[in-house]
Amino acid sequence: MFKLLSEIGPVVAFFAGFFYGGGIQSATLYMLITSVICITLCYIIDKKVSRLSIISTAVLLVSGIITLISGDSMYIKIKPTILYVIFGIIFLTSGIKKNPFIKYALESIIRLKEESWITLSYRTATFFFFMAIVNEIVWRNFPDETWVKFKVFGVVPITFVFILLQLPLLLKNKLPDSKI
């Protein structure tokens, strides 16, 4: 439960900071503080932090600090694009190398045939590249308020739909000893 809260906490802080704290600068500051607190608490509670969380927090810190110092919101807006591209590359290359990263992320939840992990890896890479393109379109063509609303209310449903679309692959190819 705490892991889920640590993932959505910074997004909620960003949304609240934007709409109740005075705009993108406040939102960025709130998100930075919340992210550092969450990753620290994850480490204290679980004694570990996932690589993806470390990458995400590092990119956030760099883009967020540059946004705060420069006053230019472009840097915080390109953060999702940078992360999506990094994650897309990770999933794509791990699929190409036949050592799918997604397997290590999800194997404790579901066990699949090896070729299904590779297929899921390619699909996940495609999803992240798609999300990078969508983020670029939204932040470059719409006002800050629209981008923030998309970040909070658009990304989650799109991700949920992507996950639902993977269910047939997962259910068809799960191994008998899978927990799901």
Swiss-Prot record:
Membrane-spanning segments: 4-24, 25-45, 52-72, 76-96, 118-138, 150-170
Annotated Gene Ontology cellular component terms: plasma membrane
Does the keyword field hold Transferase? no
Report the membrane topology from the UniProt record. Multi-pass membrane protein
Where does it live in the cell? Cell inner membrane
Highest taxon listed in the record's lineage:
Bacteria
Q: What is its main location?
A: membrane
What the entry lists under Pfam families is as follows:
IspA
Keyword annotations from UniProtKB, A to Z? Cell inner membrane, Cell membrane, Membrane, Transmembrane, Transmembrane helix
InterPro entries named in the record: YciB (IPR006008)
What's this chain's function? Plays a role in cell envelope biogenesis, maintenance of cell envelope integrity and membrane homeostasis.
HAMAP family in alphabetical order: YciB (MF_00189)
Which family, according to the similarity comment?
Belongs to the YciB family.
Recorded hits in NCBIfam families, A to Z, give:
ispZ, PRK00259.1-1
**Name of the featured protein:** Inner membrane-spanning protein YciB
Q: What is the lineage of its organism?
A: Bacteria, Pseudomonadati, Pseudomonadota, Alphaproteobacteria, Rickettsiales
